[in-house]
Amino acid sequence: MSKYTFTQKNFKVFEVPGLEGRMSAIESEIQPKLAALGTYFTDFLNTHTPDEFYAHIAKHARRTVNPPKDTWVAFSTNKRGYKMLPHFQIGLYEDQVFVMFGVMHEAKNKNHYIEVFEKHFDEIENLPDDYRICTDHVKMEKPLIKDLSTDELKEALHRAHQLKKGEFFIARTLSPKAPELKTDKAFKSYLEDTFDHLLKFYS
């Protein structure tokens, strides 16, 4: 049994109807793996940065009717939460695993953090071909950076600056049958490599 890797059974959790049923499946099937990833990558980030990180598993506590379409573990330097700070996420939808770093619209000093991305604009454009951006964390769509023009990428950062609900993340995704999900070793190696790239934008 895999400790870290998401399996086909895990992805099928998002087919369970109803809030109560899906939350029960998330808690039993996915959250133990999110907890294991949380422990492993908290240690990883604490080793690779001068700061102390904490893992936050999504609780979906505000939901009263609609079941969640995704779930995740987030990493931030605040023990009580992550939305107000730049943070890392590992999570999954029905047909996507995502790893990302950036800021939500709730972030304090959001513009400062967006400016960090802008200062590293050339590095964003030169990331490996499978890196993406996410401008709305509740949507699965994450366009590949290589498919965006320089102007389109600058516009995404500009919108994150100017719009109250603006957000910006650098992301990487896997399909459920990706070879990186075949073993815990392969998945951890993929995630470590991704975090190494994302840490370029952590400041």
Curated annotation (Swiss-Prot):
InterPro entries, alphabetized: UPF0637, UPF0637_domain_sf
Pfam families membership: DUF1054
Disulfide bonds: none
Domain of life: Bacteria
HAMAP family: UPF0637
Similarity field: Belongs to the UPF0637 family.
The protein's name in its UniProt record: UPF0637 protein Sca_0732
